[in-house]
Amino acid sequence: MDLFQFYKPYKKSLAFVIAGALLTAGMEVTFPMIVRHILGVVLPARDMQSLLYEGAGLLGLYLLCLGITYCVYCVGRTMGVRVERDLRNSLFRHLENLDFAFFDKEKTGHLVSRVTGDIGEVGNIIFEMPHLAVVCLITMGGSAFFLFYINPLLAVFVLMLVALKTGDTIFLNRKMKSAFAETRQHMGVVGSVATEILAAVRAVKAFNGENRAYQRFSDVTADLAKSQMRTFRYQAYMAGTVTFFSNAINLTIIVVGAVLMMNDLMTMSDLVAFLMYLMLFLRPIMQLTSLTEQYQRSMAGFHRYQELIRVEPKVRDGSVVADSRRIKGDVVFEHVDFAYPDGTHVLKDFNLTIKAGEQVALVGPTGAGKSSVASLLLRFYDVTGGKITLDGRDIREYTLESLHECIGIVQQDIYLFSDSVSENIRLGRTDSSQADIEAAAKDARAHEFISRLPRGYDSYIGERGVMLSGGQKQRLSLARVFLKNPPVLILDEATAAMDNETEKQVLQSLAELSRKRTTLTIAHRLATVRHADRIIVLSDGCICESGSHEELMKARGEYYDLYMSQFNKT
């Protein structure tokens, strides 16, 4: 993938920019010859009429060039903004499609830096690249031709110095490329650390961790500063050499030009035109020199964009569309093995059949693999062995979107967006009406507290629902599932953040909702799963016991020990 493919949707804009650049550069190349004619022919003849005509014509060309340049910049900058938008959207969509294994090893702040800062740098050169390429080609080529046309000897002296400067710039560009890439890397680390610390600001303050957090942030900014200083040294060297070569060229023109004029090999009008063409010739070089920093920074950002866009999701989309209205909810785990990308084995030859409408609970100690079962059913990860079927079909055959339409989940770790209550509930079904949202909230026992909010369902709840209590956030999460109304439910510690009275109310609602739906409940508090049709006890990724609450208590096995330990604590 290269940057040029993003120009394709904007071919007309690109063509306009190139055509405008051709016109303006072409006109600029003719200006010095008109001045040469005025100074060398019109002025000595004292022809006032010709002077006025040619002066007016030159002014008209200047104004025309101004108008075209304005239009080119407007169209070109608009194109640049749109390409930047396309790049950012394509990267964000790609990130959305990546699986959890990718996000387990990547820092959120680092990814945010790539979506925002890196793409922003790329957008800066979208217009400059094609525009300057055309302008420089025409201006430098035309100027070089006329320099030799006016005086070949002086042109050779001057262009030798220009060639030396160009070689020096090429050498320096190679050095700056690696320096800018390193700087972008450090900027990503700074963004990642800042995001992580600010997201956990309550924990930082609660444990008096401000100094430690500051030291951590200070360390990464120090690394960034070192990288930036290396870049600045290259920039300083480039600025110094530009000044030196400019002065050397001016000195050459003065000395050699004076000698030529003394020997009647050059006129004053020739020297003035030569200087004007030299300025035209050097201006693109100066522009390219100043653009070098921006280009290297932009390319460093684009390469980081490419690194992400080339990451292939390990969880591949299927082709079969599951109709949530027709799915019964028969779920089968057949000889399932699962290990996380770091090699940690969680499930080993795991077999479980859940009939449509059955309520099954998964219990066991921390790390037994309970939540991993839910993640596999949702295809947050794919099994490393065996298969999982929904209504007899391997879930890997379903499209991810349709599979997720069939499964509703309420997790212990709730995420609410910085939006209104209604929009947070509507995540369960985006096409739902306000009446549907309120009905779902009532089912989740959330309507009462929502009605007491300043603006009711239109109330803003802050980032991650910071303005709500833990129980209120959990009830909004439940309301999403009530609104979605899927054939399969996953309740992962769904009532963990609720007080006893609220938990009792919600459990009644869940019992009603689960009556005709396949329900997989993951619980640490065993009192919440006593009425499940079947309780599965996990230990080290394997099923060690299975049965109803009464059967397992009579067996006096691991479930009995877990239950009694919790009962004795209470």
PLM features: residue spans?
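A short amphipathic helical element positioned immediately N-terminal to and/or at the very start
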Residues: 1-11, 111
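Transmembrane helices of ABC transporter permease
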Residues: 9, 13-24, 58-61, 128-182, ...
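Transmembrane helix-loop-helix hairpins at lipid-water interfaces of multipass membrane proteins
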Residues: 14-71, 75, 148-153, 264-268
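ABC-type nucleotide-binding domain
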Residues: 318, 324-570
